[in-house]
From Swiss-Prot:
Reaction equation(s) it catalyzes: adenine + H2O + H(+) = hypoxanthine + NH4(+)
Assigned keywords, A-Z: Hydrolase, Manganese
Main EC class the enzyme belongs to: hydrolase
Family to which the UniProt record says this protein belongs: Belongs to the metallo-dependent hydrolases superfamily. Adenine deaminase family.
Cofactor or coenzyme needed: Mn(2+)
This enzyme's EC code(s): 3.5.4.2
InterPro entries, per the entry: Adenine_deam, Adenine_deam_C, Amidohydro-rel, Metal-dep_hydrolase_composite, Metal_Hydrolase
Protein name: Adenine deaminase
A GO term for molecular function: adenine deaminase activity
Organism: Bdellovibrio bacteriovorus (strain ATCC 15356 / DSM 50701 / NCIMB 9529 / HD100)
Length: 586
């Protein structure tokens, strides 16, 4: 399929007569699939059928094709067939994989389409990072759509980024076939209060999809946000919040990532009536969980087996509902004229995948591994060192505490929101346990001093954890029990070009290097997964009880998610978007 047809996935005009001939039964099919059980995600019916394929498209569905001549016939051996799965919102950078490695990891799991927002790499490298994702999408079998990163930085004036992404530069990418519209508009206060710069972006992309980001937004504020043209939200964390958003016509993108897990809370809202307005996403999911649990296939399985959602409804969310929401009219159904993106399953409830097809080709025959390095080289990933910071000293990361009361960030397990605590310190110890030192360190050569803070809920008993992944500006975040190990972990990342580090008693216990913008690895998914396993072993030995502390850490810097966050410029009270001091003023 030509790149220009990517959004519409339409059949090229010069091929249409041949496809019509195949559909009528006159022409020889390119592929005939027999002995297959159709799961109809519209009616909920399951019935035996044949699927006739010409080129990249389905030309017919029905038993009447079983005797038609075909260049190749494939017996599905009674397998069930569904449309390919669609991830409605994700940041590939959170997988730590290149787009090509992400494709290799998730396409065999049934994810034939992914709608991504590369605002992580865009915060670091600006348009150069964004354009790399566009170049990558052109080389992939998987349908990778790249939404236009709308908030770089997430909250201007509150954090330091490596680059910006001004409207004029955004417009230059608007007509690229991989761009569906505007990515999550995180600056919801700017929308609601008619910020000129924010409204200019909305106006420029009003003719395309516009994704939302509105945690806990309700009432008149939600009305104003929707009035501006925002279409969906993947940040819904309560049942009643989700119900109100559905009632007001907002697309409810139900998220189950590595940290933010909203499936259990929002699943009761999913039924036959609401399902056209509900879809699924992973948002931020690491390679360890992708390998051990799955991707969108995992979300479908959880909906069916843990939350009692009807089988056809669960699959509808992952296919037709998502395609319809984003205007991808040739995707999301097993029907004539649709792109032949198909998932064949031995068991629908277990989501036991037998084979996956993309554009009429079996994924098992694509040899994705063989072309990976060639694609990576062709796409020209940005490999310059983005850790533009001199090594730190212990003095710079020493939090000098006097007796008093301090503002403390409390981690909420499996959520990216935090709680705002005030905790007393008597000069020797805190009134509450598990309070640790933290710092956010600007890494883009601006020379800003580290911002210091306190955090509760990590469980760390010794040592330090440091990361160059700290949403969304991706400065260096470190949490530790002592300045020496904190400095060691941070300086190791500065030297290595970014990644994750665990330090204890003067030694680096584990290190995962992320040389592409301090966010992505050049290694395979298997190698990254093994590195994550080593990190887990290291931080577990130091007492950390969180499932994904590095992902949890990364969101402690994001000042558009409630309630208290630490950017490289200081503590941010997200309730009223203001800086506050570490020590509570008397």
């Amino acid at each position: 399929m030509s790149l220009s047809n990517k959004k519409t996935q339409k059949i090229a005009s010069d091929l249409l007569p041949a496809r019509l001939s195949q559909a009528r039964g006159d022409g020889t099919l390119d592929l005939l699939i027999t002995n297959v059980q159709m799961l109809d995600v519209i009616t909920g019916d399951i019935y035996p059928t044949c699927i006739a394929i010409g080129g990249e498209h389905i030309v017919g569905v029905g038993m009447e094709y079983q005797t038609q001549s075909a260049r190749r016939t494939w017996n599905a051996l009674g397998a069930f067939v569904t449309p390919g799965f669609i991830d409605g919102h994700l940041h590939i950078e959170s997988s730590m994989m290149s787009p090509f490695e992400f494709e290799k990891a998730t396409l065999p799991l049934g994810t034939t389409t992914a709608i991504c927002d590369p605002h992580e790499i865009t915060n670091v490298l600006g348009g150069r990072g964004f354009s790399w994702f566009l170049r990558s999408s052109e080389l992939m079998h998987q349908n990778l759509f790249v939404q236009m990163s709308s908030c770089v930085p997430a909250l201007p004036g509150f954090e330091t980024t490596g680059s910006d992404f001004p409207l004029e530069e955004m417009k230059s990418f608007k007509d690229h076939p991989s761009v569906l519209g505007l990515a999550e508009m995180m600056n919801f206060p700017g929308v609601i209060h008619a910020d000129e710069e924010v409204l200019a972006k909305i106006e420029a992309f009003d003719d395309l999809n516009m994704d939302g980001h509105a945690p806990l937004l309700r009432g008149k504020a939600l009305n104003a946000y929707l009035l501006a043209g925002i279409q969906n939200c993947h940040e819904t964390v309560t049942l009643e919040e989700g119900r109100e958003k559905l009632q007001k016509g907002m697309g409810l993108i139900i998220r189950e990532g590595s940290v933010a897990k909203n499936l259990r809370t929002l699943a009761p809202l999913v039924n036959e009536f609401s399902s056209p307005q509900c879809l699924l996403c992973t948002d931020d999911r690491n390679p360890f969980e992708i390998a051990h649990e799955g991707h969108i296939n995992y979300l479908i399985k959880e909906l069916i087996n843990k939350h009692g959602v009807a089988v056809h409804v669960a699959y509808r969310l992952a296919t037709y509902s998502a395609a319809r929401h984003f205007g991808l009219k040739r995707l999301g159904l097993v029907a004539p004229g649709k792109k032949a993106d198909l998932v064949f399953l031995k068991d629908l409830k277990a989501v036991d995948i037998q084979e996956v097809m993309i554009g009429g080709k079996f994924v098992s025959e694509l040899k994705l591994q063989d072309s990976l390095q060639e694609k990576l080289q062709t796409s020209q990933p940005p490999l310059e060192n983005t850790m533009k910071r001199s090594p730190l000293t212990e003095k710079e990361l020493t939090v000098n505490l006097l007796p008093g009361v301090y503002n403390v960030i409390e981690i909420v397990p499996h959520e990216i929101i935090t709680q705002h605590l005030t905790v007393a310190f008597d000069g020797q110890k805190f009134a509450e346990s598990d309070v640790l030192y933290m710092a956010n360190i600007e890494r883009y050569g601006k020379g800003l001093p580290p911002a210091l803070g306190l955090v509760k809920g990590m469980g760390l008993k010794s040592g330090a954890l440091a990361s160059s992944v700290a949403h969304d500006s991706h400065n260096i975040m470190v949490i530790g029990t002592n300045p020496a190990d904190m400095v060691l972990a941070v300086n190791t990342l500065i030297k290595s070009g970014g990644g994750f580090a665990v330090a204890d008693q003067g030694e680096i216990k584990a290190l995962v290097e992320l040389p592409i913008a301090g966010l992505l690895s050049l290694k395979s998914a298997e190698e990254i997964k093994d590195g994550i396993a080593d990190l887990k072993t290291a931080f577990r030995s130091l007492g950390v009880h969180l499932d994904e502390p590095f992902i949890q850490m990364a969101f402690l810097a994001l000042p558009v998610i409630p309630t208290l966050k630490l950017t490289d410029r200081g503590l941010v009270n997200v309730t009223n978007f203001s800086f506050i001091p570490l020590q509570v003023e008397a």
